[in-house]
Amino acid sequence: MGERTWPHLLAALLRGDELCTADTAWAMGEIMSGSAGPAQIAGFAVALRAKGETPTELAGLVEAMLTHAVPVNLPAELRATAVDVVGTGGDLAHTVNISTMASLVVAGAGVRVVKHGNRAASSSCGTADVLEFLGLPLDLGPEAVATCVAEAGIGFCFAARFHPGMRHAGPVRRELGVPTAFNFLGPLTNPARPRAGAVGCFDARMAPVMAAVFAARGDSALVLRGEDGLDEFTTAAPTRVWAAQDGTVREALLDATDLGIPRATLADLRGGDVAYNAEAVRRLLAGETGPVRDAVLVNAAAALATQGPLDADLTEALQAGLLRAADSIDSGAAARTLERWIDVAQTVRPAAV
């Protein structure tokens, strides 16, 4: 494409043409800099969604979003082994904060976690909401987050703090009220750029697209979608998994029952308001057994599996991860991780304001 303008990009999308990475990066740059108007943002998002986003197009959006992000500069060796445990949200299931709890379990097992998230979108309690309720300050800057990762084994990048340019798209997204490409960017745009991730996606078409972006940049990731629609490794149905590693993507259908996890129902995993979900975190860390623990264990196991080879048969890696995850809770390591994290975060908070 020659000179990039909104009419040119929109016309191409309406024809059904695939945009190149530079095209979508340009569009995202215009949006995040505040140069795009509401009609241009809405037209682009809807036209791209109607055509169907491709890995190439999504990669351009991700590239521009990271360019405009406030970076978290982790040491190279830490970034190479750190993992994000995150979901796109949007599954409308209103579960407890499974990925948040799994993050604490993974960190308790000795793997550094850099979590990227926001307040609730489709549910009543997002990652940021429950962490804030538990005592974690959300206004930490990049240096403070890096300190948390180094000293507590876990840090949280509050999306609103690290992607300020996304405020220009917020009103349009709310008015549209339907999922667009913006709904799938969060897990791909962690400002700390960890090289591994266990990533939930509610959309069956977009999950392999996200996996292809992870693969293209050399990350090790498991993209997860429950057959019940959960953006997690579900225990209420089989889970479709896209394993991205070494530049390739492999798809598999797994069932938590094959790992010895009892079948649950979505009602077993239902959450509530922020106080309810925070109490669920405390009960899990105190050793309470049941469906919530089971769901947390299998999602933590998926994150731990990304630290090694993602072979065609993931069962062995997941079973090993389940043992490590259970020990993280039962030894008290996960609970101590939360306590240490809050302590470090409160200590470094003044430097981040």
Swiss-Prot record:
Sites where the protein binds anthranilate 2: R173
GO function terms (MF aspect): anthranilate phosphoribosyltransferase activity; magnesium ion binding
An example Gene Ontology CC term for this record: cytosol
EC number(s) reported in the record: 2.4.2.18
Amino acids binding Mg(2+) 2: D231, E232
Residues the entry annotates as binding 5-phospho-alpha-D-ribose 1-diphosphate: 87, 90-91, 95, 97-100, 115-123, 127
Keywords: Amino-acid biosynthesis, Aromatic amino acid biosynthesis, Glycosyltransferase, Magnesium, Metal-binding, Transferase, Tryptophan biosynthesis
Cofactor: how and how many bound: Binds 2 magnesium ions per monomer.
Pathway stated in the Swiss-Prot or TrEMBL entry: Amino-acid biosynthesis; L-tryptophan biosynthesis; L-tryptophan from chorismate: step 2/5
Alphabetized SUPFAM superfamilies for the sequence: Nucleoside phosphorylase/phosphoribosyltransferase catalytic domain, Nucleoside phosphorylase/phosphoribosyltransferase N-terminal domain
GO biological process: L-tryptophan biosynthetic process
Stated family: Belongs to the anthranilate phosphoribosyltransferase family.
Function: Catalyzes the transfer of the phosphoribosyl group of 5-phosphorylribose-1-pyrophosphate (PRPP) to anthranilate to yield N-(5'-phosphoribosyl)-anthranilate (PRA).
Descriptive protein name: Anthranilate phosphoribosyltransferase
Organism of provenance: Salinispora tropica (strain ATCC BAA-916 / DSM 44818 / JCM 13857 / NBRC 105044 / CNB-440)
